[in-house]
Amino acid sequence: MKIRCFCIVLIVSGALLTEVNNNRSLSGDNLLVVNNLQSSK
């Protein structure tokens, strides 16, 4: 179950990052958030 949830999180975060890449002014902040989430796990 945890692996499945983790895969879903990766897919959703990937989709969000692709949308964020369109708005490059926000990409830096969101990358920091993603890095913090990965390091917390």
Swiss-Prot record:
Primary localisation category: membrane
GO cellular component: plasma membrane
Keyword Transferase: no
Cell compartments where the protein resides: Cell inner membrane
Entry's transmembrane regions: 1-17
Keywords: Cell inner membrane, Cell membrane, Membrane, Toxin-antitoxin system, Transmembrane
Keyword Membrane assigned: yes
Topology class, membrane: Single-pass membrane protein
NCBIfam families named among the record's database cross-references: toxic_TimP
Function (record text): Putative toxic component of a potential type I toxin-antitoxin (TA) system. Neutralized by sRNA antitoxin TimR which binds to the 5' UTR of timP mRNA and inhibits translation. The antitoxin gene is encoded immediately upstream and transcribed divergently from the toxin gene; antitoxin RNA is less stable than timP mRNA.
Assigned protein family: Belongs to the TimP toxin family.
Designated name of the protein: Putative toxic protein TimP
Organism: Escherichia coli (strain K12)
